[in-house]
Amino acid sequence: MNRHWLTSYGERIPAEINPETSGSVLEMLEHAMKRYAEKPAFRCFGQTLTYADTDRLSRDFAAFLQAGLGIKKGDRIAVMLPNLPAFPLAMLGIIRAGATQVNVNPLYTPRELEHQLTDAGAKAIVIFSGVSATLAEIIDRSGLEQVITVNPGDGIGASLPSPPVDTRLKKVTPFADALAQGAELPLATPRLNGDDILFLQYTGGTTGLSKGAALSHRNLVANTEQFKAFTPDALRPGKEVVVTALPLYHIFALMVNFITYFSIGAENWLVPNPRDMAGFVGTLKQAHCTVFTGVNTLFGGLLMQPNIGEVDFSRLRVAIGGGAAVLPTTSEKWKALTGKHILEGYGLSETSPILTLNPMTGRGFSGTVGLPLPSTDIKLVGENDAPVALGEPGEICARGPQVMRGYWQKTEANAAAFTADGYFRTGDVGVFDARGFLKIVDRKKDMIIVSGFNVYPNEVEAVAAACAGVAECACVGKPDEKTGEAIALFVAKIPGATVTEADVIAHCRRDLTAYKVPKEVRFLEALPKSNVGKILRKDLRTLT
């Protein structure tokens, strides 16, 4: 196809990358641990892990998994952690043992966690002790053979307050003990190739149940190389300082902040709780970061802090925004504060994640999600998958070495997810301009994006419909200054029912992560429907 965006690349960006530069993510990251051994790799809670420390401790954890627990190549290990020092140690250990990591949001409810663990067939979980009660609720149905609990100071030798582990959990090994045991155990380095699955990255499903995008080592090596080729001035080996406030269980931070910047010897400041804005600003004051990533709500939250002007951003080279649309006002205020515009990009869990990004050479906020990365083909299609004319909207379909192999054990979903010629259907609608810049104009799906997190209406509706007194319900997104979008739920009551807005919200809080809980519940006599009985969400949107 005609990749007209290549004319906008400039001389320094190649049209293609080699996805085989490293045989695996393990090979790429082990090289970094040796090359930058004495450099700081991670900073958190006032402590530092060097690349050599990370090498040694992740090796010990890998040995514990392999020789201590009998984990074999391809086994799935769930990781349910915030941005603690144990996260990179656990991930590197899982890879070094030859296993596949299943990333889990620590804020998940028992229902959400149970589905993900059983769907993935996870053998063990590495979990923050503070959310162990969530696991305890479903441990007997989880299929797990071992639980490894993490405290905040694990891996860095810091004595920090630690939440108690729920006593209902059995077969529990503290992470610190796992490291100590692993130090005495042998490790057999697995033979990994590009086709081996590195991550199961779960993403919301239109049926209300999330699906695991099977991301291979080649997928992540490719997206790392694509990002490096596209932003060479933001990737100086051994010189970059990154602040990671976005959660590492999210593919954006995992690929960009961790894998890519670790591979070039960057210093990474972990922010375990970005909701603590005072502490977050304090970290920024200390870090003097050269690279910062965020979503619109994160940038906006920082800009509202009264002391953000005290942060020295003079070393900042690049700020990247993703997950949800960056508002023009946010980018303008960020530019006024830091001297740098936010480079907006676009991608999905299924694409490792980056498909497009605005170039660093841009003159300002473009209002687009940028150009397709090297080795990435994007076509926009209309009815019957026919290509649309330039300037016309169409569904964004993508092909490239960063696109997933498919959803984990979902044959039917995989057949529907790709076009006949192998392009992944994103479900988003976009428009290309004459220079090859892509603008997102709509979502073919009814997905709602709250603070950069995808929310699928069917999941929310399935939970809300189980509330006593609810006859039927439907939800849509509505604009929200703080979160970009918020969930508005419309309910038709069972005749005579006395259910209230507070009742429905309380019910949803029991089974949904906080960002999926409706912000507003409105009661209607009946929901608007088509002549075949389909609820008309477009009519509901006019009521928000």
Where are these regions (language model features)?
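A short helix-loop-beta submotif of the ANL/AMP-binding
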Residues: 75-76, 82-102, 106-110, 118-124, ...
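Conserved AMP-binding/adenylation subdomain of ANL enzymes
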Residues: 221-241, 251-290, 305
